[in-house]
Structure formats: structure tokens, C-alpha cells
Regions:
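Extracellular/surface-associated beta-sandwich interaction domains
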Residues: 62, 66-68, 142-143, 156, ...
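Extended, hydrophobic/aromatic-rich amphipathic alpha-helical segments that build helical scaffolds
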Residues: 1, 23, 88-93, 160-188
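An aromatic- and glycine-enriched ligand-binding surface/loop that stacks and positions planar moieties
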Residues: 1-122
Length: 188
């Protein structure tokens, strides 16, 4: 199913020392702020619905547009998120997407002269630095939705950061072969 594909892809970036990984920055933190060796990605990138986050990293429309349509699908401006490349669903949280049991509400509703922000366009938590998306999207890639975030100073994120993946090495090799005029090798 689409959810299975999305979840398998997301696991590549959340599983320590995955078979897909060639080089990773290791984080030995057990998810507890006090033990150190963690990082703040979950706090800095997660949608504000998850309390204590600041939504500092959000995908832009240009980034979203890079995800093409799957074979057999055409772009529909009334349903722009249907039929996208599977990686889109793992990497980008958009209005109506499911994340950690929560349906993302990232839109404005106008009633007469009143404009009401969706739940995920509202600042949450105690954070003075809390923010919300300015692009209409939140980051899904690399973010561990099971990570509990409860304070601004948290360095409790524990997932490793993949610098180089096996799939990237294969694509790099194919590109080099193509540029050297070895098109058959590149396509093999």
C-alpha cells in the first residue's frame, strides 16, 4: 500500500546504521536530554502541533514541485497531492496528511471578513520561539514522530544523520557513466 511504501522509505532515515547507509553521523543519545549526544532536529523541524517545537525548517513550494507524478497520474489542481511520487508522502507534511495519528490542518478558512487559521497554523506550547509554517508545509523526512518534545532546550533527538546512502552511490555512478558517454552502462 501507499502507507507501507511511505513508512519503509521513512525508516531508511530513522533506523540507525541501515543497510541503505554508507556513512552516518552517529548519535548515541537514548532520547533523554540529560545524557547528551543527541540533536534538536525533531524540536526544530516538527509541526507545532507536537508542543515545544519551532517549525524552523519547512519545505518550500519549489521543493514540493520537484516531486513528480507517478506513472498514470496527471496533475489535478483540485487534488494536488494525489498520485505524487511516493517519496513526497514521506518527506512532506501537507494539509490533510496524517502524521503521528494527527490529520494536518494547514489552511485558512474565510467566512465573510473573518479568516480562521487551521489548527496547524497556530503557535503551540510554551516556547517563545515557537512558530508555524510560512510555506504551507512541514518537514516529515528525518523527523521521528515518536520523539517526545517538551522543552526548547531539548537535544533529545536520537536518530543518526545519513550523509551518504547506497542508492545515492548508484545514482552517482550512473551519472558519471552517462557523462563519459557510457550510456548503456549508465542505464544498466
Amino acid at each position: 500500500t501507499e502507507d507501507d511504501i511511505k513508512n519503509e522509505y521513512r525508516k531508511i532515515f530513522l533506523t540507525k546504521n541501515s543497510v541503505e547507509s554508507i556513512l552516518e553521523v552517529q548519535h548515541s543519545n537514548d532520547g533523554n536530554y540529560d545524557t547528551g549526544n543527541g540533536h534538536k532536529l525533531d524540536r526544530d523541524a516538527a509541526a507545532p502541533h507536537f508542543t515545544g517545537t519551532i517549525a524552523a525548517y519547512t519545505p518550500t513550494q519549489n521543493h514540493v514541485d520537484e516531486y513528480g507524478m507517478r506513472e498514470g497520474y496527471t496533475y489535478d489542481k483540485n487534488n494536488p497531492y494525489v498520485g505524487r511520487d511516493y517519496r513526497f508522502y514521506a518527506n512532506v507534511l501537507y494539509d490533510g496528511s496524517e502524521y503521528n495519528g494527527h490529520k494536518m490542518d494547514i489552511h485558512y478558512t474565510r467566512t465573510g471578513n473573518t479568516e480562521v487559521a487551521g489548527e496547524d497554523l497556530t503557535q503551540y506550547g510554551e516556547s517563545e520561539t515557537a512558530s508555524y509554517t510560512r510555506t504551507g508545509y512541514y518537514m516529515g523526512k528525518f523527523v521521528d514522530e515518536t520523539q517526545k518534545i517538551d522543552k526548547d532546550e531539548t537535544y533529545a533527538s536520537k536518530q543518526n544523520y545519513i550523509i551518504w546512502r547506497y542508492a545515492e552511490a548508484l545514482l552517482d555512478y550512473a551519472e558519471v557513466m552517462f557523462r563519459l558517454g557510457e550510456e548503456n552502462t549508465a542505464l544498466a
